[in-house]
């Protein structure tokens, strides 16, 4: 059984491997460059230490696959829709997004919209001019996936102390402390760089990042019960565990710069973009997670 978030958080996982029938947990662990050493103090007391000189992320299910949970932060994702169903998607193939959409203020008539794999379909239904206008509006209501914010390779290390208590039913206790960078992706954003009150001007973007320097302290035990039953368990504590904020709140926060133009134009407050994260200046970084115990 694979339980996420335990003491084994130092190991990146290939999630797709766990979907295979008959797969063992060890098959999902990804190799990472590291140094490891151990020392035996007595027959009952030992210590282990490691230092990783390489960081790798957990490989989540790719965009469009059966078990994928989203199509923008997973491998293959290139954009996120900000229109919440009010406009059509600019492309079917996410690899064509950059060639189709100009991040800024795309307008009907720009030749790049013809790069969309949806252009021929929409042009046959509505005509070339309307198809270009629809795709330009779609591009304006989409936020590009910006460069991922990967952590540094250094700064990951840990220590484990193991005690074998023969008098306590031959139980092995483990005590752990380590510092590592997140293997799981978290979502943040960049606020729109323009304040024009039109979906054609949305320049908000999505950032996939991996917070650094997460501290973990853990305890484990391993023993046997009557009847040959193995019993084991663990506890872990993180004083600064990163917790994801709802992605919709991040998107609304990234669109709050447009409120300046909406207010100046006399638009009713009901049309403003409101987020629990507050308001942001154009182009500001919107952190999409909090650190909690």
Question: What is each of the regions a protein language model found here?
Answer:
Residues 29-33, 153-157, 213-217, 290-293:
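Residues that define the transmembrane beta-barrel architecture of outer-membrane proteins
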Residues 30, 42-44, 166-168, 180, ...:
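Outer-membrane beta-barrel channels and translocator barrels
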Residues 2-5, 60-66, 186-192, 244-250:
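Outer-membrane beta-barrel translocator domains and adjoining extracellular loop/strand segments
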Residues 47-49, 171-173, 231-233:
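Transmembrane beta-strands of outer-membrane beta-barrel proteins
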Residues 1, 51-57, 165, 177-183, ...:
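Transmembrane beta-strands of outer-membrane beta-barrel pores
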Residues 34-39, 159-163, 175, 219-223, ...:
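Residues on the lipid-exposed face of transmembrane beta-strands in outer-membrane beta-barrel proteins
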Residues 66, 74-151, 200-204, 258-290:
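Flexible glycine-rich, low-complexity coil/linker segments exposed to the extracellular/periplasmic environment
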Residues 1-76, 80:
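Outer membrane beta-barrel
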């Amino acid at each position: 059984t694979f339980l996420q978030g335990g003491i084994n958080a130092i190991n990146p996982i290939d999630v797709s491997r766990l979907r295979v029938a008959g797969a063992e947990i060890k098959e999902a662990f990804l190799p990472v460059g590291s140094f490891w050493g151990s020392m035996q103090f007595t027959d009952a007391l030992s210590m282990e230490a490691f230092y990783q000189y390489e960081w790798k992320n957990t490989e989540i299910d790719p965009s469009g696959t059966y078990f994928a949970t989203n199509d923008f932060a997973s491998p293959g994702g290139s954009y996120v829709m900000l229109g919440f169903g009010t406009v059509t998607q600019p492309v079917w193939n996410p690899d064509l997004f950059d060639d189709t959409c100009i991040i800024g203020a795309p307008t009907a008539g720009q030749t790049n919209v013809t790069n969309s794999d949806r252009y021929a379909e929409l042009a046959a239904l509505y005509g070339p001019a309307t198809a270009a206008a629809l795709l330009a509006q779609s591009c304006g209501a989409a936020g590009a996936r910006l460069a991922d914010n990967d952590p540094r390779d250094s700064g990951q290390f840990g220590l484990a102390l193991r005690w074998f208590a023969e008098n306590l039913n031959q139980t092995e206790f483990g005590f752990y402390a380590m510092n590592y960078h997140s293997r799981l992706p978290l979502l943040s954003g960049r606020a729109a760089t323009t304040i024009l009150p039109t979906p054609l001007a949305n320049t908000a973007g999505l950032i996939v990042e991996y917070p650094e320097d997460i501290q973990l302290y853990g305890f484990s035990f391993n023993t046997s019960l009557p009847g040959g039953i193995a019993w084991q368990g663990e506890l872990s504590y993180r004083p600064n565990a990163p917790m994801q904020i709802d992605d919709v709140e991040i998107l609304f926060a990234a669109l709050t710069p447009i409120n300046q133009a909406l207010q100046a134009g006399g638009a009713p407050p009901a049309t403003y973009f409101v987020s629990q994260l507050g308001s942001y200046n154009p182009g500001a970084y919107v952190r999409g997670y909090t650190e909690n115990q």
